[in-house]
Design a protein with these regions (language model features):
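Glycine/Thr-rich phosphate-binding loops that ligate phosphate moieties of nucleotide
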Residues: 1-149
Length: 149
């Protein structure tokens, strides 16, 4: 699933639209479509992580927050998609916390040291890392074929 229902920012494709790729009569089940949707959103994020990695160097882990992070299925899929350790926090309102941190930093000039409790961490297996590299290559191929990226 390519989740560009209202365009996309990374890569910059404001007119792109979502699509399900590789559907057949044999695999077109509600469960497969739901999983493809979750994977598509995570692969879109993984593309952004790859861009960041190219610009800044090594990325050591991914932090999941919010409601979807509470799903064990999402955690497992994210571990496989990113091929990196996944850290799950109990901060459901991460945007509000991030905004408050930025405001405190702007007002004091010092980045606040506010600990965020970690619920769990999930380590990728070697198979996860290999699969992530292969699927990212396929994801980039879909982007190139359909969107010229």
């Amino acid at each position: 699933f390519v989740p560009y229902l209202e365009g996309e920012r990374t890569p910059p494709l404001p007119d792109a639209r979502g699509q399900l790729d590789g559907l057949t009569l044999a695999n077109m089940t509600p469960a497969n479509i739901a999983r493809a949707t979750i994977e598509g959103v995570l692969w879109s994020l993984a593309y952004g992580v790859e861009v960041l990695r190219e610009q800044t160097g090594e990325i050591s882990s991914i932090t999941l927050t919010g409601g979807a992070s509470q799903s064990e299925a999402v955690r497992k899929i994210a571990t496989a998609v990113f091929g990196l350790p996944i850290v799950v926090t109990d901060t459901f309102e991460s945007v509000a916390v991030g905004s408050a941190r930025q405001a405190a930093w702007a007002l004091t000039g010092t980045l606040p040291d506010w600990p965020v409790p970690v619920i769990s961490t999930h380590e990728p297996t070697e198979a996860d890392q290999r699969a992530a590299a292969e699927i990212m290559e396929r994801y980039r191929s879909v982007l190139a074929t359909h969107f010229g990226v």
